[in-house]
Amino acid sequence: GAQNGISPQEAQERIRQEYHAVQHTLNWYCLDYWGERLGLDICAMTSEQGPRAALREDTVPFLEALKNSGKRRILLTNAHPHNLAVKLKHTGLDAHLDLLLSTHTFGYPKEDQRLWHAVAEETGFDARNTLFVDDNEAILDAAAEYGIRYCLGITNPDSGLAEKSYARHPGLN
């Protein structure tokens, strides 16, 4: 704020406005975009926070149960590839997945129907027999709109925050 001649409150309001202006677009998730807009090294800041990344205690048993049932385990994330790499480095999640896809590779976020068509073409997944789990109702809506039959919301994706509820999808802790 001060380096731009505005108060911290004005800076916060400008960032909030920018944040809302790109909500539900790929830029909302893009570290490069925010680094350029804010003049900060967001990738370095993300790397510094890497040790905070942790898996829920039920994640690996769930993924292994899917594997043992013959199910393909695909992570589709809106996370920027750098952010994803940092999280994987600190969690080892990739060892429990068959495929990892960043929406940045496709050029569309999960909120965009074009992404679902591109991912289906890339992976051959059958929407009628797919379980999709997310913590964002708009994304669950987009998956359901595409035709994914089983959409499930995670009610406590961040143990440091209050539990979430979903208006249009079943939720699971």
Residue ranges with predicted function:
Residues 1-61, 69, 80-82:
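N-terminal helical cap/lid subdomain that shapes the substrate entry/recognition surface
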Residues 77:
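Conserved phosphate-coupling serine/threonine residues in phosphotransfer and NTP-handling enzymes
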Residues 60, 64, 71, 80-81, ...:
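Asp-based, Mg2+/Mn2+-dependent phosphohydrolase catalytic module
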